[in-house]
Amino acid sequence: MRHSLAEERREGARLDAGEAPVHGGFAEVKYIILQGDGMADYPLEALGGKTPLEAARTPNMDWLAARGVFGIAHVIPKGFPPGSDVGNMSIMGYDPAVYHTGRSPLEAASMGVALGPKDIAFRCNLVTLGGGSGGETYMEDFTAGHISTEEAAEIIRDIADKLGGDGIEFFPGVSYRHLMVWRNGKEKMITTPPHDITDQKVAGYMPTGDGADKLMQLMEASRPILGDHPVNKKRQAEGHRPATTIWLWGQGRAPALPSLTKRFGIKGGVISAVDIIHGLGVYAGLARIDVPGITGFLDTNYKGKGEYGVKSLEKNDLVFIHVEATDEAGHMGDVEKKIQAIEDFDGKVVGTVLTGMAHRKDWRVLLMPDHPTAITLKTHVADPVPFVLYSAEEPRHNGAMGYNEKDAVKTGVVAKQAFKLMEALIEGRQTWTET
């Protein structure tokens, strides 16, 4: 497969040789963003004080760290929640303080759901709530046992039939991740991401503020529908967790982002199993690249992501390759699974890309996560993350480096505003200074 891809790339290069240069003379340069979602973390006692990135075997990311601009980046601006919407907006080169309006409008764009200027999009999770010994209710599982997309679609269709109307619309997504739109709705209420409150009592995290009563009404009304749903009965019979309620959060209006083509004169694509990443791609002007077998979980087609990413560069200038499994393992609080996901990302995605691009001299990489997902907390945190800017045209010689938090800090290189890294990638900077 690698040989045939290389042959195809060489053929594509010959065909494109006569094309006019674009984006300020960088015509033949290819740009690759490699994003291992949430793979940064804190030192863990179970790993002898190492982080999962330190404990994992990552020869390909280490190779990049030894040859690129390597340091730590502040991806999440002060005052923003450490969500994937904020983090990936930064990585794609947009200042969240200017452009961020909420998470769910991005997911709506990915799903092809149009939003009017007064429409509010909400993430609609299918979750499992559990009962404590004292009668309280807690967030048992924000993924409803990683419910399948097919099962979830059946549930969301029934929710839409029974709870939709009067400006409320439901749209099925992937696994536990779905969408609700409130036409001419309200957005100023406070909502809580369910992945932030795993194993906690939900009473203190219900929606509050103007419009919260509508959300509460919908969430409560979903419980009897799901309690008697045939999909849940089948899941329980098979030993799986049921989806016991919908959980609404992450609201916002449609943002206005200038495309990367307009900003830099480049065209590109996005590879991800997650709607929010594709939604950002829609607003950034990046095409969706479909890869068979990608799931957003530990069983995803890692190698396919790398292969399709390399192949896409025959026609495109840039590819953004996102892997969700590292984040999911962090939310599970599973050290071994997170290390495995990191190693799979390194070997099957990063390694495949490095091999596929090895015959070229004119390509650049930005490697980083969007935020840490802390094993001990089972949620996102806003701490800075390790990043690498690598240029095959002008590789650096940093000595032996491991792609991890500790070695990144040792370099003394700090990107205080991570959204500026995209510009540095396009320009091919070999040093990092921030004005």
Predicted segments with their positions:
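Feature captures the catalytic ectodomains and active-site-proximal regions of enzymes
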Residues: 10, 16-435
